[in-house]
Curated annotation (Swiss-Prot):
It comes from the Eukaryota. Residues 75-156, 201-231, 271-298 form a coiled coil. It comes from Giardia intestinalis (strain ATCC 50803 / WB clone C6) (Giardia lamblia). The lineage of its organism: Eukaryota, Metamonada, Diplomonadida, Hexamitidae, Giardiinae. This is Intraflagellar transport protein 74/72. GO terms for cellular component: 9+2 motile cilium; axoneme; ciliary basal body; ciliary pocket collar; ciliary tip; cilium; intraciliary transport particle B. Belongs to the IFT74 family.
Amino acid sequence: MNRLATGTAMHPAMTARTVTRGSVQQAVGGTAAMTQVALTARPITNMGMPGTRAVGGQRQVLDLGYYTSELRNLITATNKEAEALSKQTIELQKREGQLQRQQESLHAIQREVDELQGELQDILYSQSRLSENATLEDLRAEATEAESAASKTRNEANIAYKARVDAEERLRKNEASAVHLRTEMEAQIESTLGLQAAERYRSLNDENITLKQKESELRKELQEAAAVAANAYSFCTILSNYTSGGSISGQPGHIAMDERISGVDTNIQKAITLHRQIRAAKRELDAYKAKIKAAESHDPEQSLKQQLRNRFRVEQMETQSLVEEIKITESGVQQRKKLLEEITPDATVTITKEQKDLLKSVIKAEAFLVEFPNKKLALQTSIKQAQAEVVNLISRLPIPQGTVSVPGEENPGAIEAQLQQKSRELDRTTDTEMRVNAELRTYGDKVSALTDSLERLRADLRDAESIENVEAEESTLKTKLTSLKAMHEEETKTLEKSKGALRLIEDQIAANENAQLLRNLLDQLSANLQKKYAVELFIVQKTIESCYDEPKKKCLQLVSEINNILMGG
C-alpha cells in the first residue's frame, strides 16, 4: 500500500544508520540541536501544501479559499451596510416629504390667517366709523379712494419697474462697452509700455481717483461753510441796521427813518422765518439723504451701478493719462532719434567679434533669468506628478505570495467594519438598558401603589375587627338611609310643585306686554352703555392726543430766547 509523503516526513535516503559494534555514540550538542521546534510555530508559507493539509488544523494556509472567504465576509458586511443606508435614506425621504407637506399646509394657513386678519381689520375699522356716526356711503367713498390710491401705486410700481428694466439694459450695454474698452486699453498698454508700466499706471490712476473724491468732499464742505458764513453775514448786517435805526428813531424829524425801522423789523422776522425754514429743509434733506444712502447700501443693484460708474470713471481717467503718457513717449522717441542722428556720424569705432559674443551671452543670461521661475514651477509640478504616479503604482502592486505573514492578521477595512458593528451593538445595548430601567421604574411605581392599597386594606381591617360594631353601624346607617329616602321623596314633590308654578309664571310673563317692553329697554340700555363707553374712550384718547401744553411752553421759551438774543444784540 503506497503512502503519500508528508511535508514533515524524512527522505528515504536520509534514514538513521544502524549502530555498529565498533562505533562510538556521542551526544548531540549545540543551540540548534537543543532548540525545540513546534509545528504551529513555523511560518505560514505556500510551500508544502499537501503536507500542511495532512497535519490538520494546527496551521492556517493562506490559499485561495482563505482569501475568497475573507472577500465574501467583506461583501456581506458591505451589503448589510448598504441595506441599512438605503433604509435610512428611505426614512429620510419620507420625513422630508412630510416636512414639505407640513410647510405647504403652514403656508396655506398663514395665507388664510393674513386674509382673516385683513377682514378683521376692515370690520373693526367699519365698526369704529359706524360708532362715529358715519354712514355706509362714507365707507364706500373711503373704499373707492383706497382702491384708486392702490391703482395709482400699482401704476407707479409698473412705471418704476419699466424704468428699472430700461436702466438695467443700459447698464448692461455700458458694462459691455466698458469691458471692451478696458480690454483694448490694457492690451495697448501691455503692448506699448509693458507689464510694469501698466501696473504702475493702474496704481497711479487709483490714487488719482481717491484724491479726486477727497477734493470733491472738501469742496462740498467749503461750499457749506461759505453758505453758513453768508447767512451769518446777512444776519449781522440786518442786526446792525436794526441797532442803528433804533438809535435814530427817538430823535425828532425822522419819520422816514421810523418807517424804515418798521420795515427792518418785518425783514428781521422774515429772515428769522426763512432761516428756520432753511434749517428745517436742510434737516429734511439730510434725512432723505440718509434714507437714500441706507437704501443704496441695502440695494445690491445700486451698489453694482455705483461700482460700474466708478470703474467707467477710472477707465476714462486711465485713457486720458495713457494718451498723455503716449504723447510724452512720442516726444522722448523723437528726442532720441535726434540724438541718434547726431551720434551716428561720430560712431567710427567698429565692434569686435568678442564684444558681439559678450553681448549675445548677456542677452541669453537675461532671457534665462526671465524664464527661470516658469521653468522652476514646471519642474516642481512634474516632480509632484511623478511622486503621485509612484504612490499610485505602489498602491496597485499585488501582495507578494512568498512573504511571511503573521497569523490572525486582518484587513483594516474588516477591523473598521467590526468596530462599527461593535459600536452599533453597544448603542443597542444602551437602548435596551434604558428601556429596562424605564420598565423597572414603572414596575416600582406599580409596586408602591399596590403597597399603599395593601396598607389601606389593613387599616380597614383593623377598623372592622369587631363584628358587633359593624352590625350596629350597619343598623344605624340603614335607619339614616330610610330617613334620607323619605326626605328625598318629599323634596322631589316640592320641587315638582315649584317647577309647575315657575312655568305658570313664565307663561304669564311671556304673555305680558310690559315684560317684553322691559326686555327691549334693557337691550337698548346695554347698547347705549357700550356706545357711551366707546365715546368716553375716544374722548380720553383725543384729549391726550390734543394736549399741546408742553409744545406750547417750548415754543414760548424759544420765542422769549430769540427776543432776548435780538434785544441783547
